[in-house]
Amino acid sequence: MRVLLFLLLSLFMLPAFSADNLLRWHDAQHFTVQASTPLKAKRAWKLCALYPSLKDSYWLSLNYGMQEAARRYGVDLKVLEAGGYSQLATQQAQIDQCKQWGAEAILLGSSTTSFPDLQKQVASLPVIELVNAIDAPQVKSRVGVPWFQMGYQPGRYLVQWAHGKPLNVLLMPGPDNAGGSKEMVEGFRAAIAGSPVRIVDIALGDNDIEIQRNLLQEMLERHPEIDVVAGTAIAAEAAMGEGRNLKTPLTVVSFYLSHQVYRGLKRGRVIMAASDQMVWQGELAVEQAIRQLQGQSVSDNVSPPILVLTPKNADREHIRRSLSPGGFRPVYFYQHTSAAKK
C-alpha cells in the first residue's frame, strides 16, 4: 500500500498522478492513490439518484457525469431532486418512489447531515453516498472529497497569496447543518491558523442566489472592514455582483467550481476556486453502484483529485471533468436501449 499522504495539492502537482487515478480517503486529511480499473455492466441495472437541488450548477455538472456514465455502461438512471437543503421528508418520500420504480441501487446526495431510518427504508438495496456524508452504517461506499479539504485548500491559498498581509474574511459556506458547511469552516480555520488571515464572521444560508446576496449585503453593512469573501460558488457569484458597487472590489475565493465561478476566474474577478471535479464524481457514483451490484470490490470512500484553479491555469482542459457543457439541461431519466449500449 502506498504511503498515506496529507492532501496539500496544487494544480501543478497533479501530473504526479496518472490522469485517471483516484484518491481513496481514510479520513479528512489522509488518502491513498488508487488506480482506476476497467468496468463492464453485466446488464441494464436500474439506478436511482437523489440530489438536494439542481439550482446549483455543482449538482448539474454531477448530473451530466451520471447520465454520461449511464449511457456508456448501458444502465437506467432515474434522478430526483429535493428542491433545497434540509428536505429529509421529501427525500424519504423519493426513496419510496425509487423503490416503486424498481431501483436496484440508491445514489444518495443527502440534503441533511443525517438520514434517520435509512436502513429500514432501503432494506437490502445498496446505497452509494454521494458528496454529502451522513455516516450511516449501511452505506458501504461514498463518492466525494472530504468537505474539510474544500475549505482547507482555499484557506491555504489565501495565506500564501497574502504574503503576510492581514486579511478580513467573510465565510459563506452554505446552509446550516447541511452540505458540508461545518467541515469547510473547520478546514478553512485549520489552513489559516497562525497567519494574519482573520475570519470576521460566518454567514450561513441556503444555496440560493437571492439568499446569498441578502446575507452578503447584511454582512457588509455590519462589517465594513471585510475585504475577502470565501464560500460556496453561489456566494462567490453574489460577491462578484456586489463588488461592482464598492469603491474597493471584494477579493473572491470559491470553495468549489461552477460555470459562473469559472467565468469569474477567466475575467480575474475570482482569484482561486477549488474543484472536486463534479462530472467525474457523477461518473464514479454510477461505476461504484454497478460494481456493488455485481459483487465486485468497492472502496469505502473515493474521489477524483482536487484541482486548485486560478486565473492563470483555468482553461478548458483543466475543467473538462468538472463542469457540464454549456447549454446542458438536467437529465431526470435515462433509459438503456440496445443502440445506446453499442
From Swiss-Prot:
Signal sequence interval, chain numbering: 1-18
Transport as UniProt keyword: yes
One Gene Ontology MF term: DNA-binding transcription factor activity
UniProt xrefs under InterPro entries: Peripla_BP/Lac1_sug-bd_dom (IPR001761), Peripla_BP_I (IPR028082), TMAO_TorT (IPR014301)
Alphabetically ordered keywords of this record: Periplasm, Signal, Transport
Domain of life, per lineage: Bacteria
PANTHER family: D-ALLOSE-BINDING PERIPLASMIC PROTEIN-RELATED
GO terms of biological process kind: anaerobic respiration; regulation of DNA-templated transcription
Protein name: Periplasmic protein TorT
Keyword flag Transport: yes
Family listed: Belongs to the bacterial solute-binding protein 2 family.
Annotated localization: Periplasm
Biological role: Upon binding a putative inducer it probably interacts with TorS and allows it to play a role in the induction of the torCAD operon for trimethylamine N-oxide reductase.
Gene Ontology CC, one term: periplasmic space
SUPFAM superfamilies listed in its UniProt record: Periplasmic binding protein-like I (SSF53822)
Natural source organism: Escherichia coli (strain K12)
Cysteines joined through disulfide linkages: none
